[in-house]
């Protein structure tokens, strides 16, 4: 069952016979979507807009929410997060005074779940912490998170190269010695972006294999010169928990100057999703 998000009075539809459950979005400072309620003098206008929307017979008010934009910034974001929550609370209380019953109020994203328990209201919206990843490097992992996602592939090809051989597009890597190179069938079309080649490695047979040359659309080459008995079909760990020395989503994010959200969200539809519980495969999903 899906509830719609109402972000402004212009979205209200008055001439349909269908009743739509809605959650009202209140913009308390992110300036993305929602009824503008960023400053108390301006709140009453938005409160009136929301009141008007709630009188429409084809809208069933189920909830109201806002989104914190710096709840993952530790002390740097505390004052603004508290201001956002105060604005939201003001709107909620004003509507309650008008007799408007909001069943579900929710504000807390992953950062707020970590550090702002008083903002939980009736529901929280867990995002990146569902992956077992902290929302930023700045806040403490008070929830004792354990990364839940591992990205794996297999060795597709193994070749021996002589000193002086070039690898991948642009000939950006030249073998400084005789080398053994494995090709892994994953590339930027799968969300493993070219920037991951910078200081990047994969785990093969429990050992680190440095990425060499540019990452291609569908394939990546790694140096397995010092890893014994590498053969086609061997498991390759691209990122995971880090417990066995493999890179983590946080490592890849730091190397590419981005955030762990982007690393896990970029994993493309060509990659099957295997869901495991207590060591047992529960489901396998193919999106293509």
Regions found by a protein language model. Give the residues of each.
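Internal, well-ordered alpha-helical scaffold/interface segments
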Residues: 153-156, 182
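Single conserved hydrophobic/aromatic residue that forms the stacking wall/gate
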Residues: 1-8, 13
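Active-site loop/helix belt of alpha/beta enzymes
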Residues: 14-21, 28-154, 161-162
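Short glycine- and Lys/Arg-enriched binding-loop motifs that mark or flank ligand-binding interfaces
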Residues: 4, 25-30, 59-62, 123, ...
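C-terminal accessory subdomain/extension
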Residues: 160-288
């Amino acid at each position: 069952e899906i509830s719609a998000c109402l972000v402004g009075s212009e979205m209200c539809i008055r001439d349909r016979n269908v009743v739509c459950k809605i959650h009202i979005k209140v913009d308390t400072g992110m300036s993305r979507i929602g009824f503008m309620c960023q400053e108390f003098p301006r709140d009453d206008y938005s409160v009136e807009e929301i009141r008007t929307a709630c009188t429409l017979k084809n809208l069933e008010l189920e909830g109201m929410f806002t989104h914190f934009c710096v709840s993952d910034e530790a002390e740097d974001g505390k004052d603004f997060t508290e201001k956002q929550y105060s604005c939201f609370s003001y709107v909620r209380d004003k509507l309650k005074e008008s007799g408007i019953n909001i069943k579900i109020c929710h504000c807390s994203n992953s950062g707020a779940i970590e550090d702002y328990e008083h903002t939980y209201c009736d529901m929280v919206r867990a995002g990146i912490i569902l992956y077992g990843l902290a929302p930023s490097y700045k806040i403490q992992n008070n929830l004792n998170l354990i990364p839940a996602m591992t990205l794996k592939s297999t060795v597709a090809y193994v070749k021996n190269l002589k000193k002086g051989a070039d690898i991948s597009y642009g000939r950006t890597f030249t073998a400084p010695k005789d080398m053994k190179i494995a090709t892994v069938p994953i590339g930027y079309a799968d969300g493993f972006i070219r920037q991951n080649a910078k200081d990047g490695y994969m785990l093969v047979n429990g050992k680190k294999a440095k990425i060499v040359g540019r990452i291609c659309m569908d394939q990546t080459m790694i140096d397995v010169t010092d890893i014994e008995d590498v053969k086609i079909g061997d498991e390759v760990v691209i990122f995971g928990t880090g417990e066995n020395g493999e890179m983590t989503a946080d490592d890849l994010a730091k190397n590419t100057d981005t955030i762990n959200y982007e690393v896990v969200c970029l994993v493309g539809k060509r990659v099957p999703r295997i869901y495991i519980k207590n060591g047992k495969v529960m489901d396998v999903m193919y999106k293509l």
